[in-house]
Structures are given as structure tokens and as C-alpha cells.
């Protein structure tokens, strides 16, 4: 099994601390064979909203140029993939699809951080009330689009909750795993979250209960470092996460396919024409 990671952020998202090239060098030094750089995507909002946790639209071109430059510069030492981490914002998904085609994005990972759009400031980590259902519904709807290589931190809803799982959340975890199985969308074992669990002394995400549920389905799992600083690419963390994930009866994969966004667009057009 190759040591790979497709969940990498840089200082461009305004809440991570590693520069692009620093992250690449850290990955090489720590034995990674493939590094996917997948910073939080920009969005073309209908409003004048400015997000605090992602690059702005006018910052994307520099991000793209940098990743492609590093991909070529370090091609003899590591394979670099050009990705983004994106939510499922229904009213902006057509724009995102066209954006991925135009910019030849290799893949998206699905980070379900906000409900509907972050313009509304409804954060889904530790969601309460009606947004518990909203979290799981949007996970499922997003996974069904075929636009995402995998679902990142599927247990994000447990953030800042102490890891308490209600019957409603347990049912939602089953829905995620059933959709993962039916639509062949892998699930991420999030290594940044594992670090948080270790510091706190209890589980939020990743959570044992979730992966016990996942083992009841025919799902695929992938490690995601969710690197926000160069220390997050430590090989020891990767190995520890692999050891933990290997305890569950799930298939562990080390690669994700490039997503054919042109094909997805063509299939949508066929549906519209019917």
C-alpha cells in the first residue's frame, strides 16, 4: 500500500500555516508518494460575502499556477494532484462544475462544513436541532452528485460535542455509509481529527462508533491528513492512523481517481434535454 494523502491545505485558505512548497517538501521528507493539494475552494457568491476560511475567487489563479508549477518541479520525487475541498451548496453547484471543467481540477473532496452556503453562517460541525438532519441530508445529496472523490471527516457533526452520539446521529451515520456503498464514494479517516482526539482524551472525529457502522457496509476508506501545517504531514501520524483504521473491517484504499467533470456535465445536459 502506498503512502498517499489527498487532503492538504496551505496558507491560502487563511487558517492554515504552510506555504505550498513547504507542504510539498514536508510530504517528500515524510515518505509520501502522492500528495493531493486540496485547499478550500473559492465560490462565486451572489452576494458581496467574503469568507474567512477559504481563498477568494481572485486568489485562485495564483493557487492553480503554484500547484501546477510544483507538480512539474517535483515530478521526479512525488506525484502531485490538483484538487479542492468543497461543500455541497445546491445553488452554486452548476457554477462549481463549470469551474472544475474550466480549470481542469483533478478532484474535489467533500467537506460538509456549512449548510446551504456559508453566506448564511450555519456551520455543521456540532450541528443541533433541525441542522442535524440537514447535515446528513446534504452529505447524502452531495455524495450522489458524483463530483467528489470522497467524503472528508464524515463525523464532523460530532465536533465540540464530546463525541456523544444520539439515536438520530447514529441513524445518520448509517445513511452516510449506505450512500457510500451505493454510490462508491469513499469515506475519510481524518488524521487531523485524530490528533485532536489524542489531545482531548476522547473521540469526536474520527469516532469508533462510526467506523463500526461503516464496517457493516461495503465501503472504502482512505486516510486524509487534513494538513494545515507541515507537522500534520508527519509519517508517524500517518502510520498511527493506518494502524487505527486497520482495526475495522473496511477496505482501505490509497488512491482516488481523477473525476471526469466534462462527463458529469454532459450527463446533466442529457437530463435537461429530456
Language model regions located:
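An N-terminally biased module of ancient metal coordination in phosphate/nucleic-acid-related enzymes
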Residues: 1-86, 90, 94-95, 100, ...
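Charged catalytic cores and adjacent phosphate/nucleic-acid-binding surfaces used
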Residues: 1-10, 20, 25, 158-274
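Structural preference for beta-strand elements that scaffold enzyme active sites
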Residues: 2-5, 34-36, 79-83, 106-109, ...
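Acidic (Asp/Glu)-rich catalytic clusters
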Residues: 3, 28-29, 66-77, 96-106, ...
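Divalent metal-binding pocket/active-site signature
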Residues: 17, 42-45, 106-199, 204
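Serine/threonine-rich low-complexity intrinsically disordered regions
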Residues: 46, 93, 117, 128, ...
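Short, contiguous clusters of charged residues that form electrostatic/catalytic patches at enzyme active sites
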Residues: 62-65, 133, 137, 209
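Residues at the C-termini of beta-strands that transition into short coil/loop
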Residues: 84, 111-112, 256
